[in-house]
Amino acid sequence: MSQRDYYEVLGVGRDADESELKKVYRKLAMKYHPDRNAGDAKAEERFKEIKEAYEVLSDSNKRAAYDQFGHAGLNGGVGGAGAQGFSDAFSDIFSDLFGMRGGGRSSVHRGADLRYNLEITLEQAARGTETKIRIPRQEACDTCHGSGAKPGTSPKTCPTCNGHGQVRMQQGFFSIQQTCSHCHGSGKIVSDPCTDCQGAGRVKRHKTLSVRIPAGVDEGDSIRLTGEGEAGASGGLAGDLYVVIHLASHPVFQREGNHLHCEIPISFTVAALGGEIEVPTLDGHARIKVPTGTQTGKIFRLRSKGITGVRNQSTGDLLCHVAVETPVNLTPRQKELLEEFESISQKDGSLHHPRAKSWMEKAREFFTE
């Protein structure tokens, strides 16, 4: 349905975690729900858009595909649900909010997300590439398999929260659940810790990963590698790794969205007489015709010679900015010819310098006012 950026729809950053997504979704969905906006077609459409965005970003697999390839990575996208999906969409949100989960359960901690800044060339960004990165991170201890307990032993149920990971506090008419301070939410107590990880269940290691960079990425884009962040505590899920793209400066091109810019120096004779010159492109070279009287600042646009974007799949243009070069290190003969040209130009009064004449006219008007 929606082709807007899902992060923009929810108003969150690309590194938003699950709790932030849920909080924002709950707020927006309750605001635009059709039951609260009866007969408001725009509110209903906005609600569907919000729900569609949340369904993608709250699913780790769909989110990873979307982060890499945009809407094209979702195999046709996710169909927006109508108001009939309200109860299903909010069941886990309300149960979290009011502590209505049945039976109680111990809390495990998801591992931290990691960020890796990766610099690539403009050519790699345009065509896509695959590269290897090495990251430091917390991984589950091989000896205790992440439990933190010495081999042959196992963690015991926390006596304070009876393994729930939370304790209930009564405040007036309200009953509030809080994380157990004894087991820190794990529901387990390690009395005989693993000697390799000192009971932490995690150890510091370096991991080499292969990262596929899709064609068309731009500065600041991030690629999410699900489960490649730090290991969770007490057997919790691992966090994610966000590889943030940075473009190295290029000796010829500057990128602006999907467009490319470059400066093309041409001789003053070609600028005056016209001609044909060769200009660089990402794919090789192209030839452009230079009309007579071309001035510095003239822009030649080569259609579809820019970059094809990773999200909208539209291809930008190459914009060539002319810089007319003044000759240096003249030979006596060259200097003589130029002096002759200048002398003839002044005698016949012809308009050989349009910008100079325009500037002189403006200056004359300024001083005679």
From Swiss-Prot:
The keyword Cytoplasm applies. InterPro entries: DnaJ, DnaJ_C, DnaJ_domain, DnaJ_domain_CS, HSP40/DnaJ_pept-bd, HSP_DnaJ_Cys-rich_dom, HSP_DnaJ_Cys-rich_dom_sf, J_dom_sf. It is found in: Cytoplasm. One of its GO terms (biological process) is chaperone cofactor-dependent protein refolding. Its main location: cytoplasm. A zinc finger (CR-type) spans 128-206. NCBIfam families: DnaJ_bact, PRK10767.1. The J domain is necessary and sufficient to stimulate DnaK ATPase activity. Zinc center 1 plays an important role in the autonomous, DnaK-independent chaperone activity of DnaJ. Zinc center 2 is essential for interaction with DnaK and for DnaJ activity. Homodimer. This is Chaperone protein DnaJ. It comes from Nitrosomonas eutropha (strain DSM 101675 / C91 / Nm57). The lineage of its organism: Bacteria, Pseudomonadati, Pseudomonadota, Betaproteobacteria, Nitrosomonadales. The gene is dnaJ.
